[in-house]
Amino acid sequence: MNAEQIIKSIEAEHLKPNLPVIHVGDTVRVGVRIIEGGKERVQPYEGTIIAMGNSGINKTITVRRVFQGVGVERVFLLHSPRIANIQVIRRGKVRRAKLYYLRDRVGKATRIQQRFDRPL
């Protein structure tokens, strides 16, 4: 085995098998595990996926939402143990791989048309 095959086999052990099919433009609810003191809880973070990056164990999504008039973006590693679950709330119809133009838009201009041809 060469080095690349060894790395892929080690990464394959840590991949999450039950991730939903997600695309840029989808509205998702990401459950993030948070440890406070001795307790662990799951905090939901809901927003629109504006970018997806890489593949394999390094696959990331950038989720954007507007909270109290301020745009907040978080980058999540999909295969991280900190991610408890990912739930697709709504499918979006977009024609771009990256939706960075939404950063400059405010209010109703940030809406994305809903897509019905893909199941939730």
UniProtKB/Swiss-Prot annotation:
Entries under Pfam families matching the protein? Ribosomal_L19 (PF01245)
One function term, GO molecular function aspect: structural constituent of ribosome
Which PROSITE patterns does UniProt cross-reference here?
RIBOSOMAL_L19
Q: Which GO terms describe its cellular component?
A: cytosolic large ribosomal subunit
> Which is a GO BP term held by this UniProt record?
translation
Give the keywords, sorted: Ribonucleoprotein, Ribosomal protein
What disulfide bonds does the UniProt entry report for this chain?
A: none
Q: Does the keyword Ribosomal protein apply?
A: yes
Q: What does this protein do?
A: This protein is located at the 30S-50S ribosomal subunit interface and may play a role in the structure and function of the aminoacyl-tRNA binding site.
Q: Which HAMAP family match?
A: Ribosomal_bL19 (MF_00402)
Protein family per UniProt: Belongs to the bacterial ribosomal protein bL19 family.
Protein name listed in UniProt: Large ribosomal subunit protein bL19
Species for this entry: Gloeothece citriformis (strain PCC 7424) (Cyanothece sp. (strain PCC 7424))
List the top taxonomic levels of the source: Bacteria, Bacillati, Cyanobacteriota, Cyanophyceae, Oscillatoriophycideae
